[in-house]
A protein has these predicted regions:
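Alpha-helical membrane insertion/targeting regions
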Residues: 1-150
Length: 150
């Protein structure tokens, strides 16, 4: 029942999708703040919050996946859209591809942080992860617009 409640953005999206979209929209800003903690040499706090953000993101992703499956997936979302199926599907595949690569890089960055710090690669890996999270937010908004606005 909860998964089918109407969202709060005033679109065709269900409530769970609006909740997830709001959280994903905040992710790059939260991550940027955590990155700046490292620049201020607050490394322990940086590591703690980065780990928490990662775990919360995985929980949100799981909530999203359950919700999508519960309401019928991409096909059910496409029923209300005025956008062509193939176009929306390609955008969705791009979004999913970016998300998968970003999660792999983020996981590796967290697990290999000490080693990356020693060889000077952690900072670069962090910025790549930040870029990926930002692209997830942007492509996710694109998918949301195609499925629930147009």
């Amino acid at each position: 029942e909860f998964m089918n409640l109407p969202g709060f953005f005033g679109t065709r999206a269900p409530l769970f999708m609006d909740i997830v979209s709001l959280i994903v929209a905040a992710l790059p800003f939260l991550m940027l703040g955590i990155i700046f903690l490292a620049r201020q040499k607050k490394y322990k706090l940086h590591a703690l919050l980065q780990g928490i953000l990662y775990i919360v993101s995985l929980i949100v992703l799981s909530f999203f996946e359950v919700g999508v499956r519960f309401v019928g997936g991409f096909k059910s979302f496409m029923q209300g859209s005025g956008v062509g199926h193939d176009y929306a599907f390609i955008v969705l595949i791009v979004h999913i591809s970016i998300a998968v690569v970003t999660i792999i890089i983020w996981t590796t960055t967290l697990l290999m942080a000490k080693k990356q710090l020693e060889n000077g690669k952690h900072k670069r890996a962090g910025w790549i992860t930040f870029t990926g999270v930002t692209l997830i937010m942007l492509t996710g908004a694109w998918v949301y617009m195609l499925l629930f606005v147009y």
